C-alpha cells in the first residue's frame, strides 16, 4: 500500500494486466475494485485473451471472479497481518486506513471480511476495533434511550478545548481526521 495523504490525488494505471506474461493494458478499472486502484502491481491471468476490449472486461465472468478473488485475497492478507502482529498493524493503519474504509463503504463482501480488523483511533493515539470501542464506551457514553454516543474530533489541534471538555466528562474522543 502506498502512503496516501489526506489531500491525495488518485493515480491510476499503477496496476498492469498481463495474459500469459504478455502485456494487455494498464487500464484495469474493470478488473480491480475501485478501492484498490491506488495499489501498484501486476496481474497475470491465462483466462484473459490477448486481444481484449473494455466491453469484454466489463461483461466477462472470469474477470468478475478475478476482481472478487483480489478483494478476498487483500482482505485475508490484512486480516492475517492484524491477527499476527496487531501492534505492527496499528503502526501501518494511518497508511492503509483509506483503502480499508473505502473498501468497506463500496464493497459489501470486503466489509464482511474487514469489519473485524478495521480500526478506530482516539485522540490519545489508542486503536480499537468497532466492537472493542463499543465495549469501552458503553458505560459512560450512552444516552437516555440507551444509544451509544460517539464523540469525535476532526482536528485535534484546533478542537483541543472541545476535546478537553469531553475528557473532563470522562468521554473518549475519536480522531476522525481522514477524507473518509
Task: Walk through the language-model features, giving the residues of each.
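Conserved GHKL (Bergerat-fold) ATPase module
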Residues: 1-180
